[in-house]
Amino acid sequence: YKRQVPIAPDAAPLGTAAEESRSIKAVAKRFGADLVGIAEIDLRWHYATRVDVRDFSKAPNELPDGMTHVIVMAHEMAPELVATYPSALAGAATGMEYSHEAAIAIQLASYIRHLGYDAVASMNDTALAVPYAIQAGLGEYGRNQMVLTPEYGPRVRFSKVFTSLPLAAAAPRRLGLHDYCQSCTRCADSCPPRALPFGGPEEGGDSPPTIRG
């Protein structure tokens, strides 16, 4: 995560947590996010350590004190480019959305800090995006190992903003997508390196790689 601007010394007056959640979602969409959800911070999804890029050593992966919620944003990838996978154009769609989401997350974190509350923007660092996106009600986990959203399917990238702003967390939604994946194997059948599982989800034990060659 990164801090971009100082926290305003005087906190802005707030409404209820539900009101602030609606407001912050509207602001995030104004900045360019396509989907927005909110979850309580759950340390199960956080990386144990991070890499200090100055010497590539392990460093503690700790958020600032007082963080209580994470705002999860989904960013749609261009369908006409994604449809060309595997190609350089599809790779460009990925890179373009990473740049886009970084700008949006930093803007939202800066906005919250101007309100007088702490906020840090995060992309792929700090914590896993997939379980947080599910926890924030943005979609369900699919056989393809991705979050399936009802609006865009898996064609999204995620960013996060950790914050101390009092918000109301969403609940995971049962959309029927996860259940559908239990009987459908179309993505696994179509995967050239056979990297996707055919059976149902399992918990615990080793997870041997399915890629051959």
Say what each PLM segment does.
Residues 8-41, 45-48, 105:
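Phosphate-/polyanion-interacting regions in eukaryotic proteins
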